[in-house]
Amino acid sequence: MLKQKKFFISTPIYYSSGNPHIGHAYTTIIADVLARYKRLFGYDVFFLTGMDEHGQKIQQKAFEENISPKALVDRNSIIFLNLWKRLNISFSKFIRTTQMDHEESVQKVFSYLYKQGKIYLGQWTGYYCVSCEENYNPAEIIKSQDNIMLCRMGHKLETKSEESYFYKMSDQAPFLKTYYQNHPNFIIPNERANEMVNNFLNNLEDLSISRTTFDWGIPIAENPKHVIYVWLDALMNYLTATGYLSNNEELFQKYWCDNETEIVHLLSKEIARFHCIYWPIFLNDLQIRFPSTILSHGWIITKEGKMSKSLGNVIDPNVLIDTYGVDALRYYLMADLSLFRDAIFSEDNLIETYNTQLANSYGNMISRTLGMLKKYRNNIVPKYVGCVLKNDEKLENLINKNIELVQENINKYSIDKALNCIQEILVEANKYIEDNKPWELAKNQQEQELDSLLVHLVKVIQVTTTLLSPILIEGSKKAVEQLNFDESFLTLASLASYDIFNYHKVNDSKPIFARIIVEKQ
């Protein structure tokens, strides 16, 4: 018996100082879609997401609201969880860094690395960004027109000097450069690896990993006036969520200790530095395998540029769900936005993509096919007898080829290209209808030809519904109900067979994706 393949995918844990926006939704939907596809492909999947709940910014925010930091992060974790529920996110675990088991494991990690000589006590002086939770040296800062020091994200910097524990990193750059070269798929896209080398590794410094100016964090057991700085705390969630250094390491052993597990960290490009440089150094010193791939996607921007609260162009995914529905949002983000570059979010494009690819193409194919089955065959799918029409074989070959291409593209994280392959099947099927003219086949009593056409169209619906099911969670369920399928019809194994529909009775058609009509101003 073949060993089941394993797939571990994580989002970054999201900082718990504010409400989720479209960027959070985008990252999490990508991870969910990849997790669902891998389950469809037969993988054992562990999908991790959660909240980063320590740090100065949270402590300040709680003070401003006159509540405790714990009350703030408790409230915000519920807000994120409610959004994930609305977006049909199928995570395996939702971790919070304020959980006791995480905090205890992080303290153990610090103590181990300190005893190994990887960590030392020193003095940190420089520029600090509260918003980014990041230190900046003079070479990295930007001066505004009025001479204010800004970080690369445009936030105001503070000048600080304090006692800090440091992680020895300055001598690890050659090791990482070699690893990048020998493992070209470690960082995707490849230009992100080049950014790491050119912008950071050539001047890699030891990393400050503790703070004394605030206390909302994990205290260091050896020196409790220090709390562990966000990145050593936050990055460890990928291990602690699986029970690393706890009383139950079963999941850690299952996923992290198996070198054949495909481990993917999905994240936005602004935090690539921490995952591509600091994280592998931590793992190397802990003698733990590296992730297979760090998948660093681009930003969602607007026509005005990057989203920011000050510009008032931050997009609330809840509003989009209320307006267009969850499937429309999930599909648009996966179909129109490539992971590997920045993409402009446009509601006009969302509507166009929805109407063209879901309402007109996929939804209309279901309506037309079920309508013909009702009209010509009393809702009964005819028996499959092979290729009868001259273009039956062409359609079958395209279906088989594109099923494989969808899998190949998903395994390369090219979700948009996979969806193009699915749409190609639907476009060809519409052409197949127009070429064969079922209304004339019925009129001329060409029963065998009409039967073949109907069977092949049901196969098109089964294949496209199966391949779209990781994205269209609600729409695929409605399609299954109308087709009177059970879950066994929506598996890769079932896609190879045409005779599973023999004399299968379908239900009447109801619109699944009604067109969005935009009133002209």
From Swiss-Prot:
Record text on cofactor binding: Binds 1 zinc ion per subunit.
Query: Which keywords belong to this entry?
Result: Aminoacyl-tRNA synthetase, ATP-binding, Cytoplasm, Ligase, Metal-binding, Nucleotide-binding, Protein biosynthesis, Zinc
**Enzyme Commission number(s):** 6.1.1.10
User: For this UniProt entry, what's an example GO CC term?
Assistant: cytoplasm
The cross-references to SUPFAM superfamilies, in alphabetical order and at most eight, read: Anticodon-binding domain of a subclass of class I aminoacyl-tRNA synthetases (SSF47323), Nucleotidylyl transferase (SSF52374)
Coiled-coil region(s) at which residues?
none
> Which InterPro entries does the UniProt record give?
Anticodon_Met, Met-tRNA_synth, Met-tRNA_synth_2, Methionyl/Leucyl_tRNA_Synth, MetRS_core, Rossmann-like_a/b/a_fold, tRNAsynth_Ia_anticodon-bd
Motif ('KMSKS' region) on chain: 306-310
| Localization annotation | Cytoplasm
Write out the residues that bind Zn(2+).
C129, C132, C151, H155
Record-level GO BP terms? methionyl-tRNA aminoacylation
- Please indicate if the UniProt record lists Nucleotide-binding as a keyword: yes
Q: Pfam families per the record?
A: Anticodon_3, tRNA-synt_1g
Q: Which GO terms describe its molecular function?
A: ATP binding; metal ion binding; methionine-tRNA ligase activity
Binding residues for ATP: K309
Provide the leader sequence positions: none
Write down the superkingdom of origin. Bacteria
Reactions that this protein is recorded to catalyse: tRNA(Met) + L-methionine + ATP = L-methionyl-tRNA(Met) + AMP + diphosphate
Q: Which family does it belong to?
A: Belongs to the class-I aminoacyl-tRNA synthetase family. MetG type 2A subfamily.
Q: How does it assemble?
A: Monomer.
Record HAMAP family: Met_tRNA_synth_type2
Protein task: Is required not only for elongation of protein synthesis but also for the initiation of all mRNA translation through initiator tRNA(fMet) aminoacylation.
PANTHER family named among the record's database cross-references:
METHIONINE--TRNA LIGASE, MITOCHONDRIAL, METHIONYL-TRNA SYNTHETASE
| Name under which the protein is recorded | Methionine--tRNA ligase
**Provenance organism:** Ureaplasma parvum serovar 3 (strain ATCC 700970)
